[in-house]
Amino acid sequence: NLFAAQEGWDAGRCYEKLGQTSDAVRLYTKVVELSPNSNWATMAQYRLSAIK
């Protein structure tokens, strides 16, 4: 679901900016699971690699 993936991405960015990286990782991972071939998943994977 692209809409849910976008929401997850947006929420992940918010958590990341607040310094709550464990919540950001959880949401970015969910984005990849929900829509693995979307641009949202690509961006989420990039952020996951930057956090770790």
Regions found by a protein language model. Give the residues of each.
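Short solvent-exposed coil/turn linkers within tandem alpha-helical repeat scaffolds
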Residues: N1-A4, V31-M43
